[in-house]
Amino acid sequence: MAYYMDTWAAAPAERPGMIASLSLSFKKAFAELFPQRRRGHSEGDYPPLRGSANNSLEEHYRWQIPIKHNVFEILKSNESQLCEVLQNKFGCISTLSCPTLAGSSSPAQRVFRRTLIPGIELSVWKDDLTRHVVDAVVNAANENLLHGSGLAGSLVKTGGFEIQEESKRIIANVGKISVGGIAITGAGRLPCHLIIHAVGPRWTVTNSQTAIELLKFAIRNILDYVTKYDLRIKTVAIPALSSGIFQFPLDLCTSIILETIRLYFQDKQMFGNLREIHLVSNEDPTVASFKSASESILGRDLSSWGGPETDPASTMTLRIGRGLTLQIVQGCIEMQTTDVIVNSGYMQDFKSGRVAQSILRQAGVEMEKELDKVNLSTDYQEVWVTKGFKLSCQYVFHVAWHSQINKYQILKDAMKSCLEKCLKPDINSISFPALGTGLMDLKKSTAAQIMFEEVFAFAKEHKEKTLTVKIVIFPVDVETYKIFYAEMTKRSNELNLSGNSGALALQWSSGEQRRGGLEAGSPAINLMGVKVGEMCEAQEWIERLLVSLDHHIIENNHILYLGKKEHDVLSELQTSTRVSISETVSPRTATLEIKGPQADLIDAVMRIECMLCDVQEEVAGKREKNLWSLSGQGTNQQEKLDKMEESYTFQRYPASLTQELQDRKKQFEKCGLWVVQVEQIDNKVLLAAFQEKKKMMEERTPKGSGSQRLFQQVPHQFCNTVCRVGFHRMYSTSYNPVYGAGIYFTKSLKNLADKVKKTSSTDKLIYVFEAEVLTGSFCQGNSSNIIPPPLSPGALDVNDSVVDNVSSPETIVVFNGMQAMPLYLWTCTQDRTFSQHPMWSQGYSSGPGMVSSLQSWEWVLNGSSV
């Protein structure tokens, strides 16, 4: 999955005939575009995001979600509804793509692979660049960026004419691109995320040395860009630049490209996030030339296989049933941030073995002391439990091997025991090593088979349990990873053959992004959005829909607002399709459960979600009108407010991390909630209504308004609505109304975090509003309260709020949304490693200077080396 800007604004470039420095060009362009940066402005000084669900930030992130061919066919027939739901619910634009069905030829073939330097791999591929899945594709362009024929023409034909339009804008702004220069545009409908247009030299015998130097210059500029100036690029595909219509001799061309790449990285210590360089062509002579040059300059292919092959991704995720997520992760077991980490060892020696030693080293001496007690015990248990101590987990499950018991049965029983211990409500995630493959010397394929069997059996038996199961493979243990990868693929295929629609998703997990991209020809949902959080939520919703075999549950309190028209739609769906729909309403939440065959199920869910989006907008619109009315009361500014209403709703933008917010961030993280983003809320109309309410409370009671900073968790789907019209009890997460039917806030982040851990899986994002709440006069709450009780028996005036404990309140309940003003929205996760993923640093305020531009811009490198 990728998350890149797809358009860039024109930048001033070095003029032809001058030596171009990439660093200099970039700095000049940046200074010209964003002069406020020179004046030392912090991120808080940049223009904020405007509006409601769709902010005007023009930085786009593009992700691809792989799906099965049968799912593609179903979604294709519901594509307009899918687009509408993703747009209205998550603010994302979506398209469907299926290269194989579109007539693409044979799958991509890799014919050479070699480690260039530690951390970067170079490979040669036979593939069509218009369908090669990498982060950036290099186009062989001309000085005018007119993409009419050859590779350039093919890229525009497949990717869309917007690529040519962006190129024309660049030329209009900066003029021709010099030979050796590059320009960056979006990729349109191509499976990559941006195109690097490189202007290669034309070959002439009389000026051959100049052409050679210019080709080297172009390659260096490409490498500079992907290693220094766009740190989000991990994979780049480069063609045999200039070897086509520019008539550069093929073998000389490929040799120069390889030698330039080798020399570029020879002494480099820093190379950004780049991990793979693909040399790509769909023509056999060019592929052969690239391969020959690679072997000559880099040495022979060190791969263990003889023929073309595609690497598996570094992380695999499989959704099983309703609540279980199974992942294969490359990483260190002792660094996992799940609730449980699994260790193993012989009964009298839990300290032997590489995994055990790594865990003990990280956990500290306290765990060693605990295990010393276990070693002295004569009782045999399959699994011993200790605290996590200095590990980032709550518990460690120690699997005890026994030399006199069948090792296959031990592993089977140990897996079952570990998983059953996860039924405790405070455990939502567990990390296993490749159990049995070390000290027990089980065949790796056998261990994988047993571990998967037990996970699947657990998921089948405990369908309602939300649990993330990670199998963590040490990064250098490629053989074990491939074996577990193959077993996961086999299990996924079995799910699909049995009618389960669960899509096997190759995606980032535990902070790692997949390396190789989608398999060529794989159908996919292409998502584009302006916020990483929105994209995560959209992906989670899609996967939850597709993993359901024959049922889907929609939880949305706006179901309470469905009228006759909407219920007629539900009835019509049950008549015209093979689905049944049941509605459940409780004091905590309202749900619709849809059951039926997969195709009908997806169709019904799409239509219902569209309907609920309309209802939510209608309800919010009415509340907004009331809000405008309240904010104008008692003032002489009604006419001014009326004019503002036409052009202003609210602002939600990255907050500058003041000392106060940094301290608050530490409070979140102390409770196990890792902050990925904090946004400030600015809604002048809501603030005016809040201040009016505050004034009324201060005039009414001697205690005044009693303002406090409190917290409330809100589902993603209601975050923008709260920013727009304020808090309402139907917008919060489900709760037990033990103190009355009001709007619940908490003073304690620890209490909020404890509730999150019991109800949310570790891979979900958590949204917490920090608000100024007018508590005023309060009393003990009661479940029968629909408004606060009177100030005293028989009094007409009532309290302003109720609490859980009058002497030391932790939970505060108000019954009027105007008593709470949202100030900040904190987006968190329980997975610390996920919170450190580089995607969160793009456009969010995680520290001084960590802000992306609020403009689209095309960056051009121009100039000549001679």
Swiss-Prot record:
What does the record say about tissue specificity?
Highly expressed in the thymus and intestine. Expressed in macrophages.
Where does the record place the PARP catalytic domain?
Answer: 635-853
State the Pfam families in the record. Answer: KH_PARP14_8 (PF23254), Macro (PF01661)
Q: Which UniProt keywords apply?
A: ADP-ribosylation, Antiviral defense, Cytoplasm, DNA damage, DNA repair, Glycosyltransferase, Immunity, Innate immunity, NAD, Nucleotidyltransferase, Nucleus, Phosphoprotein, Repeat, Transferase
Q: Where in the cell is it found?
A: Cytoplasm, Cytosol; Nucleus
Q: Which residues form the Macro domain?
A: 109-298, 313-492
**Induction details:** Up-regulated by IFNG in macrophages. Down-regulated by IL4 in macrophages.
Q: Which Gene3D superfamilies match?
A: 3.90.228.10, Leucine Aminopeptidase, subunit E, domain 1
- One GO CC term of this entry? site of DNA damage
What is a GO molecular function of this protein? Answer: transcription corepressor activity
Regulation of its function: Binding to poly(ADP-ribose) does not affect its activity.
Main location per UniProt? cytoplasm
Upon deletion of the gene, what happens? No visible phenotype. Mice are viable, fertile and are born at the expected Mendelian rate with a slight decrease in male frequency. No defect in B-cell development, maturation and maintenance in periphery. Slight decrease in the number of follicular B-cell associated with an increase in the number of marginal zone B-cells.
Report TM segments.
none
Described by its record, this protein's role is as follows: ADP-ribosyltransferase which, in association with E3 ligase DTX3L, plays a role in DNA damage repair and in immune responses including interferon-mediated antiviral defenses. Within the complex, enhances DTX3L E3 ligase activity which is further enhanced by PARP9 binding to poly(ADP-ribose). In addition, positively regulates DTXL3 protein levels. In association with DTX3L and in presence of E1 and E2 enzymes, mediates NAD(+)-dependent mono-ADP-ribosylation of ubiquitin which prevents ubiquitin conjugation to substrates such as histones.
Assembly and binders: Forms a stable complex with E3 ligase DTX3L; the interaction is required for PARP9 mediated ADP-ribosylation of ubiquitin. Interacts (via PARP catalytic domain) with DTX3L (via N-terminus). Forms a complex with STAT1 and DTX3L independently of IFNB1 or IFNG-mediated STAT1 'Tyr-701' phosphorylation. Forms a complex with STAT1, DTX3L and histone H2B H2BC9/H2BJ; the interaction is likely to induce H2BC9/H2BJ ubiquitination. Interacts (via N-terminus) with STAT1. Interacts with PARP14 in IFNG-stimulated macrophages; the interaction prevents PARP14-mediated STAT1 and STAT6 ADP-riboslylation.
Q: What is this protein's name?
A: Protein mono-ADP-ribosyltransferase PARP9
Species whose genome carries this gene: Mus musculus
Q: Which gene encodes it?
A: Parp9
